[in-house]
A protein has these predicted regions:
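Conserved beta-loop-beta/alpha segment of the NTase-like Rossmann-fold superfamily
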Residues: 1-50
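Catalytic-core segments of class I nucleotidyltransferases/pyrophosphorylases
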Residues: 2, 18-22, 52-119, 123-133
Length: 212
């Protein structure tokens, strides 16, 4: 069983992860060093000895390391013991608690990798991933409209979007959204949302929202 959270953006080839899993046939998870103890509080923390995970703590208040699970898992058939896990009155809501339980039951292997990883489940990290992907460039869809406007670095304008008389930087403008007479930076403007005569910085504007 292969499980990958949809808010992951990582740089490794998934076939490498699967090959690593097959070499052990034990539960395996991808592990990344976030390099920051405060960030580590938001993830499952891993303690590794050799080629085995010896401790797993789901979102600890006081992390001792920065190596975390990124919610990319592979399980052999004999490790899919959900009925047994739930029968023990364990937490049913987050997979990290199941991993913590598995570590107590037997061998769980890490697949440690370098390079990029972004948890794009928040607006800030999503924009960080966009910045990495665009690398200072802009992408404007062929049927988007940009008139009398200045686009700074890392702007992605999707089909049907309209930008007029505005300055936009480090922002994603989704389908059929519009920005008029505004300065918008570090923001996500969702589908069919509109900004008129208002300046935004660090905003997440939901679908069909209006700011004016």
């Amino acid at each position: 069983l292969l499980v990958i959270a949809g808010d992951n953006l990582f740089g490794f080839d998934i076939s490498e992860f699967i090959d690593h899993f097959k070499s052990y046939e034990d539960p395996t998870l991808a592990a990344y060093d976030v390099g920051d103890l405060e960030k580590a509080k938001s993830y499952g923390l891993i303690d590794v000895e050799g080629d085995e995970i010896v401790d797993f703590q789901e979102k600890p208040d006081d992390p001792k390391s920065t190596l975390v699970s990124i919610a990319c898992y592979a399980f052999p058939a004999d490790a899919i013991r959900f009925d047994e896990y739930l029968a023990g009155d364990n937490n049913p809501d987050e997979p990290g608690w199941f991993i913590q339980w598995l570590v107590d039951q037997g061998s769980v292997r890490p697949f440690s990798f370098d390079g990029i990883w972004y948890d794009i489940g928040t607006a800030d990290s999503y924009l960080e991933a966009v910045e990495f992907a665009l690398d200072g460039d802009n992408i404007v869809a062929d049927d988007a409209t940009v008139e009398n406007s200045e686009l700074g670095d890392n702007v992605h304008v999707l089909p049907g979007a309209t930008i007029k008389n505005s300055t936009v930087e480090d922002t994603v403008v989704f389908q059929d959204a519009s920005i008029t007479d505004a300065d918008v930076t570090n923001s996500v403007i969702d589908e069919e949302a509109s900004v008129h005569d208002k300046d935004l910085d660090g905003s997440l504007l939901g679908q069909n929202s209006r700011v004016q």
